[in-house]
From Swiss-Prot:
Protein name per Swiss-Prot or TrEMBL: Protein BeeE
Source taxon at top rank: Bacteria
Family designation: Belongs to the phage portal family.
Ranges that cross the membrane: none
Source lineage: Bacteria, Pseudomonadati, Pseudomonadota, Gammaproteobacteria, Enterobacterales
Leftover remarks: Encoded by the e14 prophage. Missing up to 260 C-terminal residues compared to orthologs.
Gene: beeE
């Protein structure tokens, strides 16, 4: 019967990496033909390129502001350093539109976006984009911080 074999374990090999987990639940970049598609190869297709470009440019044009919440009242936090980062200059070589276009492009093609926070005097001074393909989630190797909370850990390939 079909249903008797549906819920049985297919192999005894444990899933140990995020890539194996993605393959196990069907989130890999394999196509129905069995060939893998990279984000660079997908961008060579006119339909994919056009869709990603329209999304990225549309979101890139939108204003991005930071707000304080005082009770039930929202106020624009123009005096905050973080407001300047996300609305006027995220880093020394990108405009906010270019930065947000890159964010949306990475989200569409890779599913994630990472930025390195460059800190100066305890405050974030720049947001430097990091290639999502070069970042590995440190599964099970998170450290405990003095406050007792767990934080997600990432490392570069």
């Amino acid at each position: 019967m079909f249903f008797s074999g549906l819920f049985q374990r297919k192999s005894d090999a444990p899933v140990t990496t995020p890539a194996e987990l993605a393959d196990a639940i069907g989130l890999s970049y394999d196509t129905y033909t069995g060939k893998q598609i990279s984000s660079q190869r997908a961008m060579r297709l006119t339909a994919v390129f056009s869709c990603v470009r329209v999304l990225a440019e549309s979101v890139g044009m939108l204003p991005c502001n930071l707000y304080h919440l005082n009770g039930s009242l929202k106020q624009r936090a123009t005096g905050e350093r973080l407001h300047k980062l996300i609305s006027t200059h995220p880093n020394g070589y990108m405009t906010p539109q270019e930065f947000w276009e890159l964010v949306v492009t990475c989200l569409c093609l890779r599913g994630n976006f990472y930025a390195y926070k460059v800190k100066a005097f305890g405050e974030v001074a720049e947001l430097l984009p990091v290639d999502p393909g070069c970042v590995v989630y440190a599964l099970g190797r998170c450290q405990r911080w003095p406050e007792g909370d767990r934080r997600e850990c990432y490392s570069a390939r």
